[in-house]
Amino acid sequence: AGNIYATALTGAGHEVTGFDPGPADTPEGVRRAESAHEAVAGAEMVLVLTSASVAPAVADSVLGALTPDTVYADLTSATPDVMRSLSARVHTTGARFADVAILGPMTIGGAATDLIASGPGAPEVARVCASLGAEVEALPGEPGEATARKLLRSSLMKPLASVVCEAVVAGRAAGAEEWVREQIASQLTGGAELVDRFLSGTVKHASRRSEEVRATADFLASLGVPNEMTTASELTLRRLAVNGVQG
């Protein structure tokens, strides 16, 4: 996702500096920093696109580089409580925090994928990302509100994807895969393309999505809502992250 945003922002005329501790390719026109702190220094806007588990550590590593002129946008799938905690840390620097939720696979929508944002930095994030073609809903609430909406959506989408995958694998084992696919497609407005997307994307992004679903289950539990299906989806995603194959 970071690569996608960096490419789009560079193409839109913005000066982009990025950091990735892994071997990810550096998009053309993007300056690659040696550290997150270096990448953030002097930036007008910071986009954090890591796994949710490291979001607090990332924030702590760059606090010294933030200024009151900086918008710090966290686009991870951390829980609402974590987003509020991150906002409090960022607030100590005078920077404006934005809790930003990505609604859909960026492999399909790219930088134009729909977003929800909340917090003091939300209007600026909405302005910049809308210029990239995204539809951005800037909520009036505090940080954590956007992530809460995404996790509520995930309580539908991630279990749905897992159930679809399970049904297709079962149909395959029974020699009736095409029939099962037709049954699923007839019930979903996305049709056959959505089924294929579930089958490929669920395995490809299993590790990251398992963290998101864990956060979703925790959020539902905090609301006093039973979350057996969400928890079961987490177990499925963790299995797929290890095995890398359906069935």
Q: Each predicted region: which residue ranges?
A:
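NAD(P)+-binding Rossmann beta1-loop-alpha1 motif at the extreme N-terminus of oxidoreductases
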Residues: A1-G42, A65, D69
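A generic structural signal for well-ordered alpha-helical segments
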Residues: L9, D25-P27, V90, C129, ...
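Rossmann-fold dinucleotide-binding core
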Residues: A55, A78, V82-M157
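Rossmann-fold NAD(P) dinucleotide-binding segment
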Residues: A36-F97
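Helical "substrate-binding/catalytic lid" subdomain
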Residues: A148-Q246
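Hydrophobic beta-strand scaffold residues
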Residues: V16, R32, R96-A98, V136, ...
